[in-house]
A protein has these predicted regions:
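Active-site bordering "gate/hinge" segments
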Residues: 1-215, 364-366
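Short, glycine-/Ser/Thr-/acidic-enriched flexible segments
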Residues: 58-60, 103, 171, 180-182, ...
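A short secondary-structure junction signal
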Residues: 64-67, 107-112, 186-188, 229-232, ...
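Short solvent-exposed loop/turn micro-motifs enriched in small/polar/acidic residues
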Residues: 157-159, 227-229, 264, 293, ...
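Long, well-ordered mid-to-C-terminal structural blocks that present hydrophobic/aromatic surfaces
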Residues: 208-263
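Active-site lining segments that contact anionic ligands and/or coordinate catalytic metals
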Residues: 213-215, 231-233, 240-243, 266-270, ...
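Dual-mode signal for accessory low-complexity, basic/Gly-rich regions
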Residues: 245-314
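Extended hydrophobic packing segments that form well-structured cores
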Residues: 319-366
């Protein structure tokens, strides 16, 4: 299909978590500090400004039981290799899309009561519904959905909120925004006018908060699957934009490694609004997959921000982006914080508040 669409060249790369597990289990220490061929390929591709389609087919527990020190060291070294080269993709300068496909480890973790064949069939059915493929006219369904998201991101940008207030079980948080916030989501457009959807499915409208303006406590409402490890029942305490305390019922060591990665990994780079009435949330699943979990409910990302979520941000240098409050990190980890019990209000310059999310649903009409 890519060639039929006019591509000059198509490169297919396979990444296997079992190979990574073998690296950490049997490789020498140097293997956990080496730059992988995968990272070299990605860095080269990003530098060349290629479009890419990533098929996320991951076992959320692929690296369970592996020494987090070895995994964390590998993550840090390899993230640093691709970080600068990835800047154009984070700035939405070239088209890219992430989708997901079932693999045994993933389907069995989501549907543990079923045999593999039944679990796989159920997963494909859920994916088709979440991606609106089951609709009589999927293309028209997507056009309608993207138009709704576009109206909502225009509304939120026009309101010029200075902060977001989160309230829910275990959550009492204020996240300050930058001085010129822009909300994005759904279909986005490159500077050359090429539209694309970074995520399929997509239910979110998001912005990048100010890196120094978060305070309070927030609790995750779903597990975070990160590099083959599962972090569960976790929370953050924020002060002056930084995580100053945290805890987890499972995967606390992995969480600690994420937070300690660099100067921006313990700060927020994204705040996204997602309603519980969306097509992903309607499945009622704990997906254990970042793409699906982040489009299931509101989320906040640790780490790197999106320059396009600041007015004129794409044209700023890295130092200028930092100066206006856009966070920078080799990490971008989406933490799901929304549910039917969580509400988010936008704070206006005069201190008054307006509902954005009320008990998990949109609190405004766009």
């Amino acid at each position: 299909m890519a060639y039929e669409g006019g591509a000059e060249d198509v490169e297919v790369q396979w990444f296997d978590a079992e190979v990574d597990r073998s690296r950490f289990t049997h490789g020498r220490d140097a293997a956990s500090r080496a730059v992988s061929q995968r990272s070299r390929f990605l860095a080269s591709a990003f530098e060349d400004g290629v479009s890419y389609l990533r098929v996320s087919a991951e076992d959320p527990a692929a690296l369970a039981g592996i020494d987090p020190e070895r995994v964390g060291g590998f993550m840090k070294v390899n993230n640093e290799v691709v970080f600068e080269a990835r800047a154009g993709h984070m700035a939405l300068e070239v088209p890219w899309t992430v989708i997901a496909a079932p693999v045994p480890g993933w389907t069995s973790s989501v549907f543990p009561e079923d045999d593999l064949a039944e679990a796989t069939e159920r997963m494909w059915s859920a994916i088709f519904r979440a991606c609106r493929i089951d609709q009589p006219d999927p293309v028209e369904a997507w056009r309608t959905h993207l138009a709704d998201l576009a109206a909502r991101k225009r509304h939120l940008t026009d309101r010029r909120y200075v902060a977001l207030r989160y309230r829910g079980p275990g959550t009492d948080l204020e996240v300050g925004l930058t001085d010129r916030p822009v909300w994005d989501g759904g279909s986005v457009t490159t500077p050359e006018g090429r539209p694309f959807c970074p995520n399929i499915p997509t239910e979110e409208v998001f912005t990048s908060p100010h890196r120094d303006r978060a305070s309070g406590r927030i609790a995750a409402t779903k597990p975070l699957s990160y590099f083959g490890a599962l972090i569960e029942d976790f929370w953050f305490e924020m002060a002056d934009g930084r995580v100053v305390d945290s805890g987890a019922g499972g995967g606390a060591d992995v969480l600690a490694r994420i937070l300690a990665t660099d100067g921006g990994s313990a700060r927020f780079g994204e705040a996204a609004m997602v309603p519980q009435s969306g097509a992903v949330a309607a499945e009622g699943l704990v997906w254990k997959n970042t793409l699906y979990d982040e489009n299931d409910a509101c989320h906040i990302a640790l780490g790197s921000s999106y320059p396009t979520c600041f007015e004129g941000g794409a044209a700023l240098s890295p130092d200028e982006r930092l100066a206006v409050g856009l966070n920078q990190s080799v990490v971008h980890a989406d933490v799901v914080v929304g549910s039917s019990e969580v509400s988010v209000h936008g704070v206006l310059p005069d201190g008054s508040k307006e509902p954005i999310i009320l008990a998990g649903e949109w609190g405004f009409t766009a």
